Curated annotation (Swiss-Prot):
This is Aspartate carbamoyltransferase catalytic subunit. Keywords: Pyrimidine biosynthesis, Transferase. L-aspartate binds at residues 87, 182, 253. InterPro entries: Asp/Orn_carbamoyltranf_P-bd (IPR006132), Asp/Orn_carbamoylTrfase (IPR006130), Asp/Orn_carbamoylTrfase_sf (IPR036901), Asp_carbamoyltransf (IPR002082), Asp_carbamoyltransf_Asp/Orn-bd (IPR006131). It is an enzyme of class 2 (transferase). Its EC number is 2.1.3.2. The keyword Hydrolase does not apply.
Length: 338
């Protein structure tokens, strides 16, 4: 395993192939320990992981905290409603306070895009050793979700040992509200790094044509793309035609607040055109894997029958895989030469 080069993890846009391989190799090791019956290891004993979630979360928050505990780290949980934020303290000052308390890593979720960059910049300016791990920032990025999604697909397609190269030239269909999804953005960076060709499918109000140029989007402090050749992005407005050629499908949650923004005619019409059903899946002659980052809206973006009965619906696999992936990220940040 290479020396880990990142003090902070904000985005997958600056991940190299060796970075991905380090995460997957370590996650696979943790997976094997779990399968052998090992519930806890002392890898991060004496380390303090602080969870700063300013948005509601079930999977990510609990998964990170469980990952930290499985590594024997101490876990400190932040509750916005009972913090000094109610007295006017800024988010950055809150982060500095927890750093001063001795936090080794701050796991942060917030509604503001790029907020983790700002926090990390301030911590570095005061020579703090604390790392920042982005658990979802606005519409920008959700690195651990992107990693666990691609890890789930690699495990599915690998015949024997874990092999990320199995994604090369695979057609991965992403359905839904890409424009408002930090998960989708992280998936685009991760999937394309291994040569997957991505099809984005949905109405133009949720997937604007400019997503074709997604990889040209500037990332703070990044000079060049560490991936020399990425897979392609195409946009489709026909779910049926896209399903016919897909090797895997990632369904995104339809955020119902988009109705208030007049981006959709109705939820029913969206579900009719872009909801994933058994009937639509039958257009593909393979039993392809289905992913969804959760939480799901049953019978809107995906039918209950697909969730409950389709043999390769991997939603629960994603949840399970989130734990070793997040264990790997927490562990690697502590191996950075601070």
């Amino acid at each position: 395993m290479q020396i880990w080069p990142h003090k902070h993890i904000h985005t997958l846009a600056n991940f190299s192939i060796p970075d991905y391989e380090s995460v997957f190799e370590l996650a696979n090791r943790f997976d094997k320990l779990k399968n052998a019956g090992t519930k806890k290891i002392p890898a991060l004993q004496g380390t303090l992981i602080t969870s700063l979630f300013f948005e509601a979360s079930t999977r990510t928050k609990n998964s990170f905290e469980l990952a930290a505990k499985k590594l024997s780290a101490d876990v400190q949980t932040f509750a916005p409603s009972s913090s000094s934020l109610t007295k006017g303290e800024t988010i950055i000052d809150t982060a500095i306070t927890y750093s001063a308390m001795g936090a080794d890593t701050l796991v942060i979720r917030h509604s503001s895009s790029y907020i983790t960059f700002e926090i990390a910049k301030k911590l570095d300016a005061i020579n703090s050793n604390t790392s920042v791990l982005n658990a979802g920032d606005g519409l920008h990025s959700h690195p651990s979700q992107g990693l666990l999604d691609i890890y789930t697909l690699i495990k599915f397609f690998s015949k024997k040992s874990l092999n990320p190269k199995v994604l090369n030239s695979k057609k991965i269909l992403i359905i839904g509200d890409v424009n408002h999804s930090r998960v989708a953005r992280s998936n685009l960076w991760a999937l394309s790094a291994f040569g997957a060709d991505i099809i984005l499918c949905g109405p133009e109000t949720l997937i604007p044509d400019e997503f074709i140029n997604f990889f040209k989007s500037p990332i703070p402090n990044q000079i060049e793309d560490p991936i020399k050749s990425r897979g392609s992005i195409t946009i489709s407005r026909s779910l049926e035609e896209s399903i016919k050629i897909a090797d895997a499908i990632i369904v995104l949650r339809l955020q119902k607040e988009r109705m208030m923004e007049n981006l959709l005619n109705s939820i029913d019409s969206y579900s009719l055109d872009y909801g994933l059903t058994s009937e639509k899946l039958s257009l593909n002659n393979k039993e392809i894997p289905i992913l969804h980052p959760g939480p799901i809206n049953r019978d809107i973006e995906i039918s209950s029958k697909v969730v409950d009965e389709y043999p390769n619906c991997l939603i629960n696999n994603q949840v399970a895989n989130g734990i070793p992936i997040r264990m790997a990220l927490l562990y690697l940040l502590q191996k950075y030469n601070k």
